[in-house]
């Protein structure tokens, strides 16, 4: 499995939500509405989810293994940080 494209759809500067991301896997599968969230200790990736009939949020799609989760999260966070860095260079100021 290879992430072949990462699109930063939206950057958010207020609250804990930092970005909305879409990824493409193997040029065959797109996953939208992945969130970059500022946690208490670090940034993390939240996979797309829906609220079930009991009001509990359940992931719609997610990596199965810890290794796959770490790989997906690592690539997404790297792309997010690179995007912020490029915005800072373009604008001459910090974005977040």
Regions found by a protein language model. Give the residues of each.
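Single-stranded nucleic acid-binding surfaces, predominantly the OB-fold ssDNA-binding core
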Residues: 1-96
């Amino acid at each position: 499995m290879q992430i072949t494209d990462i699109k930063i759809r939206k950057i958010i500067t207020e609250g804990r939500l930092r970005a909305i991301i879409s990824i493409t896997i193997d040029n065959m599968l797109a996953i939208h509405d992945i969130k970059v969230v500022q946690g208490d200790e670090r940034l993390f990736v939240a996979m797309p989810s829906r609220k079930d009939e009991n009001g509990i949020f359940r992931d719609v799609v997610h990596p199965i293994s810890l290794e796959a989760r770490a790989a997906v999260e690592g690539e997404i966070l790297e792309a997010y940080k690179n995007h912020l860095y490029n915005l800072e260079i373009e604008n001459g100021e910090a974005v977040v």
